[in-house]
Amino acid sequence: MSPLTQTLLMILAAYLAGSISSAVLVCRMRGLPDPRLQGSGNPGATNVLRIGGASSAAMVLFFDMLKGAVPSYLAYLMGIDAVSLGLIAIAACLGHIYPVFFGFKGGKGVATAFGAMAPIGDDLAICLMASWVVLLLISRYSSLAAILTALLAPLYTWWLDDRFTIPVAMLSTLIIIRHKDNIQRLLKGEESKVSRKKRPKKS
């Protein structure tokens, strides 16, 4: 099989894997409202946190990251070049954003993108996760934490393993473009902060 054929097949596989909406499936499994119709309307971990609590959100986050990590790591093991790795990772994110199995209405692609970056190395994964958590705790804005972490990701990659700076920059650009509406709301002071679903008090 030629390198081009390998790359094209991996791009297709990554898109199909990304099209599996973890948020919708977890909410169905747990008897929660459809995240596309509740809260912010975004089928991602942050919205599931709002409507279903931390355990459901953690499941969504894990599976969304896995959708990016598995295709990227498999492509790396196959010896596919760095730029093509970036295209494969973007395909997984586009599957998450425009899922063929769920009416092409998906999430922002943040967890899937960070999952695709994680196989580059444990040190990069730790830097990304630490940055996102710290920025979220400081600002309480999930979107702002994602945007700033996406901006930092190519710098971390250049510092830790510069072979993958270009594909990571490609992913970061996609994340920022996907958050254009959030950026406008942040500038206007209209963006919602993260809050957990409140449990009813026991009588």
Curated annotation (Swiss-Prot):
SMART domains: G3P_acyltransf (SM01207). It comes from the Bacteria. GO terms for molecular function: acyl-phosphate glycerol-3-phosphate acyltransferase activity. Keywords: Cell inner membrane, Cell membrane, Lipid biosynthesis, Lipid metabolism, Membrane, Phospholipid biosynthesis, Phospholipid metabolism, Transferase, Transmembrane, Transmembrane helix. Catalyzes the transfer of an acyl group from acyl-phosphate (acyl-PO(4)) to glycerol-3-phosphate (G3P) to form lysophosphatidic acid (LPA). This enzyme utilizes acyl-phosphate as fatty acyl donor, but not acyl-CoA or acyl-ACP. NCBIfam families: glycerol-3-phosphate 1-O-acyltransferase PlsY. Pathway: Lipid metabolism; phospholipid metabolism. PANTHER family: GLYCEROL-3-PHOSPHATE ACYLTRANSFERASE-RELATED (PTHR30309:SF0), INNER MEMBRANE PROTEIN YGIH (PTHR30309). The lineage of its organism: Bacteria, Pseudomonadati, Pseudomonadota, Gammaproteobacteria, Alteromonadales. It holds the Pfam family G3P_acyltransf. This is Glycerol-3-phosphate acyltransferase. It is found in: Cell inner membrane. Probably interacts with PlsX. InterPro entries: G3P_acylTferase_PlsY. One of its GO terms (biological process) is phospholipid biosynthetic process. The keyword Transcription does not apply. It catalyses: an acyl phosphate + sn-glycerol 3-phosphate = a 1-acyl-sn-glycero-3-phosphate + phosphate. It is a multi-pass membrane protein. Belongs to the PlsY family. GO terms for cellular component: plasma membrane. It is an enzyme of class 2 (transferase). The chain crosses the membrane at residues 7-27, 82-102, 118-138, 141-161. HAMAP family: PlsY. Its EC number is 2.3.1.275.
